[in-house]
Amino acid sequence: MTQMEEAKRGVITEEMKKIAKIEKIDPEKLRRSVAKGHTVIFRNVNHDWVVPVAVGQGVRVKVNANIGTSRDIVNVEEEIEKAKIAVKYGADTIMDLSTGGDLDFIRRKIMKAVNVPVGTVPIYQAAEEMLARGKAIIEMTEDDMWKAVEKHFKDGVDFVTIHAGVTKEVVEKLKRVNRVVGMVSRGGTFLAAWILHWGEENPFYKNYEYLLELAKEYDVVLSLGDGLRPGGLPDAGDELQIAELYTIGRLVKRAREFGVQTMVEGPGHVPIDQIPTHIRLMKIASDNAPVYVLGPIVTDIFPGYDHISAAIGGAIAALNGADFLCYVTPAEHLGLPTIEHVKEGVIATKIAAHAVNLTRFEEDFKIDYQMSLARGKLNWKEQFKIAFDKEKFIEIRKERPTKSEACSMCGDLCAIKIVREMLGHKARS
């Protein structure tokens, strides 16, 4: 039975108990939320060593880090190190988006390297295998697509992005809608091109019940991908995005009836003032399914700094109901990220998630409160102990030292130091 089916029967599973203990929440509330489909639990039945993670209502906003090879750069050890660094700096999950090299080997190595849930996009493997055989992506058969999905499920992948909402009807609209950027989802584009070439319906939509059967067998969470997401600010909220969203909403309902867990993927580029509306619309269309957003990026003119843009958008999205933030690195739109880029991307997105979590969970706020106390006392040892990135803390302190008990920005002109000394002087008087 899936986590959702057990929850509907009134059973609090071992995974729910573990999550409730980690999150310090009521396990019964978690069970009810999972039963409704408002919260999902990542834990493939074949992924024995994973620490289960919950995403959705009543739990903390989570962070995902994408890693993986490309056709240009295949360095498996580097990708494994990226996964470890991502987890070290706060990623709750990893997605392996590899498109170069031995994809089965890479995926399995990454899964063994970390104990967090791992997600994938199986259509990438189906497409890559076509290219490896000297064929065009559109030559892949429905069987090729399903084999990739089943292989990932059997390997223990906890959640997968499936672009079931890229239907033949929506693709027909693509011909007449004048988009500035077009389609930017790789998986969505592979399927759209396949549909246009063969004139057939998306296999994941046409045979959605078969997908549900597979997902149910392994208790894999279906992350219903936004193949028509906006790839630039001018395309945000257009009819293609909204048409796909409502199709996804209907697919969520069918999955719940089947006892399969689902979440909904959200837009990538959205003007900052439109983010609350986008998130609310996603929640309405999906009857409060967990929302998984990439960013969203709030401005398009800062390549090299898109991790900052995404953190701004992610904080606003999470405050308005987004449950799961996919990180963006400084390399976004420019190239394959390095290990350092991964670290920077995770920390930026972790800031966004924590900024929202501390407004909802007393325990999270207490950490910031303790830091405020330490700063008020100029207690550098305690500040170091609490600091999220201790390496950065030490690096800057060593780089710019001071003889005063304050920092080298103010030294003896430190406001905290002056007020403390004055108050201490008056008290002695």
Swiss-Prot record:
Signal peptide extent: none
GO molecular function, one term: carbon-carbon lyase activity
Catalytic activity: 5-amino-1-(5-phospho-beta-D-ribosyl)imidazole + S-adenosyl-L-methionine = 4-amino-2-methyl-5-(phosphooxymethyl)pyrimidine + CO + 5'-deoxyadenosine + formate + L-methionine + 3 H(+)
Pfam families on file: ThiC_Rad_SAM
Annotated binding of Zn(2+), by residue: H269, H333
Segments forming a coiled coil: none
Pathway annotation: Cofactor biosynthesis; thiamine diphosphate biosynthesis
Superkingdom field: Archaea
Cofactor comment: Binds 1 [4Fe-4S] cluster per subunit. The cluster is coordinated with 3 cysteines and an exchangeable S-adenosyl-L-methionine.
UniProt keyword annotations, A-Z: 4Fe-4S, Iron, Iron-sulfur, Lyase, Metal-binding, S-adenosyl-L-methionine, Thiamine biosynthesis, Zinc
InterPro entries in the record: ThiC, ThiC/Bza_core_dom, ThiC/BzaA/B
Gene Ontology annotations of biological process type: thiamine biosynthetic process; thiamine diphosphate biosynthetic process
Cofactors, names only: [4Fe-4S] cluster
Enzyme nomenclature, EC number: 4.1.99.17
UniProt-annotated binding residues for [4Fe-4S] cluster: C407, C410, C414
Enzyme class per UniProt: lyase
Residues annotated for substrate binding in this entry: N66, M95, Y124, H163, S185, R186, G187, D226, G227, L228, R229, E265, Y292
Protein family according to the UniProt entry: Belongs to the ThiC family.
Function: Catalyzes the synthesis of the hydroxymethylpyrimidine phosphate (HMP-P) moiety of thiamine from aminoimidazole ribotide (AIR) in a radical S-adenosyl-L-methionine (SAM)-dependent reaction.
Entry-linked PANTHER family: PHOSPHOMETHYLPYRIMIDINE SYNTHASE, CHLOROPLASTIC (PTHR30557:SF1), THIAMINE BIOSYNTHESIS PROTEIN THIC (PTHR30557)
Name the UniProt record assigns to this protein: Phosphomethylpyrimidine synthase
Organism: Pyrococcus furiosus (strain ATCC 43587 / DSM 3638 / JCM 8422 / Vc1)
Phylogenetic classification of the source organism: Archaea, Methanobacteriati, Methanobacteriota, Thermococci, Thermococcales
